[in-house]
Amino acid sequence: MSIGILGKKLGMSQLFDEQGKAVPVTLIEAGPCRITQLKTTETDGYSAVQIGFGETRDKLVNKPAKGHLAKSGEGVLRHLSEYRVDDVNGLELGGAVTVSDFEAGQKVDVSGDTMGRGFAGYQKRHGFSRGPMTHGSKNHREPGSTGAGTTPGRIYPGKRMAGRYGGKKTTTRGLTILKVDSDRNLLVVKGSVPGKPGALLNIRPANRVGAKPAKGGK
């Protein structure tokens, strides 16, 4: 049973299928993750599993977190994540969650922070068309109209404008696991995932599995 796992993006590569077609893949170093807490309906009101990933220096973790992590084993962990489950039977505090809990062909959802690109303009951030480049135009990469005048006398919230681009959490759904390497803690996932190499990723079984419905709901 795969509940979910934390990992680190290593980068992208490619595999060749049986027809010799190149398939883009992402290599993810996932786990091993330590089970740091088991939540039950009797004590917490719901059933869940909390896991930790990525050992870090002792001085970077405060005392409450150290006390919490000490209940599940030695060593402090940098990242924690919780997954809802139907039942925690069969799971043990201090146990390990590894890539062997996943299998090739399984669909997963991968969450992470997108690449931060800093302050960006209208064209780069939103894909706006630019203005004329010649004939005396000075409106090359400007936004154009941002709204009416005296009425409403303001710019409506949500107006697409220049600003910080990227660096936000997003989820890529329905990715297929092509290969599982238990010896090297690797997941080979078809396609791309959020973030740059070294970024933290949250991998969990897909919650939307099946063919997409046709337009009109038929």
UniProtKB/Swiss-Prot annotation:
Gene Ontology cellular component annotations, sorted alphabetically: cytosolic large ribosomal subunit
SUPFAM superfamilies membership: Translation proteins
GO biological process: translation
Gene Ontology terms for molecular function: rRNA binding; structural constituent of ribosome
InterPro entries listed in its UniProt record: Ribosomal_uL3 (IPR000597), Ribosomal_uL3_bac/org-type (IPR019927), Ribosomal_uL3_CS (IPR019926), Transl_B-barrel_sf (IPR009000)
Region of interest called Disordered, as start-end residue ranges on this chain: 125-168
Its biological purpose: One of the primary rRNA binding proteins, it binds directly near the 3'-end of the 23S rRNA, where it nucleates assembly of the 50S subunit.
Entry's family note: Belongs to the universal ribosomal protein uL3 family.
HAMAP family on file: Ribosomal_uL3_B
Name recorded for this polypeptide: Large ribosomal subunit protein uL3
Gene: rplC
